[in-house]
Amino acid sequence: DFSLSLDARSTAIVGENGAGKTTLVKLLKGLLSPQKGDILYGRENIKEKTVASLAKEVGYVFQNPDDQIFQSNVLQEVMFGPKNLGMKNAEEMANEALEMVGLSHQTQANPYDLSLQERKMIAIASVIAMDPKVMILDEPTIAQDSVGKDRIANIIKVLRAKGKCVIAILHDMDFVLENFERVMVLFHGKILAEGEAEEVFCQDEILHQAKLEKPYRIALKEKIEEIYGVSKTKRKDNENS
């Protein structure tokens, strides 16, 4: 039960399990219908659009790639979405997407012979290949090592450079701080806070209520400022004595 407006900024949706994050993005994708109220994409109510037509505008990468992958060949999996553009164009777009996610050497592999980390990348590539204006990523950093997280960060950067709107559900607050312009904190189905990442993560009361961990960089900065403040006070006391 809330009102919000999403713009071109990259947006991270955070909150504890059960806060309503996945429900929200499924509403945005048209996989669920709101019980009341409206969701507008541009000026058009998504209730008036089919899931198929909305898929051309809004791409959604599932948290579990196995809920999304169904082909027995990586290239065929990624080509499936843009097939309506012709096989040649679909293959070019699929290869470009696989290059972006670091799997250009696995085009002929069976997705289920690859690791969970790689399958998540296949799922991301499948949506990138469809070239939607909005990309929704559900927990993209889960099962990723530092190399995988760096690659996802680069994918977000490339998508933003192409003018895409990137929305992601995340539990990794350090990743959120470094890669997203805007943060939305959900709590029991309501927006507890939203704004620029640096500002939101400095609100201790909000983080405590939402059971979120403060990003390391901000926690370290605050600790240094606290220590500096103490030493500065001591220095003044010494000067006055």
Q: What kind of region is each of these model predictions?
A:
Residues 37-45, 54:
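Conserved ABC transporter NBD signature motif
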Residues 135-138:
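Catalytic Walker B motif of ABC-type/P-loop ATPase nucleotide-binding domains
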Residues 170-171:
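H-loop/switch region of ABC-family ATPase nucleotide-binding domains
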Residues 188-189:
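Conserved ABC ATPase "signature" C-loop
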Residues 110-114, 118:
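Conserved ABC ATPase signature
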Residues 89-106:
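Conserved ABC ATPase "signature" region
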Residues 29:
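Helix-to-loop junction immediately C-terminal to a conserved catalytic motif
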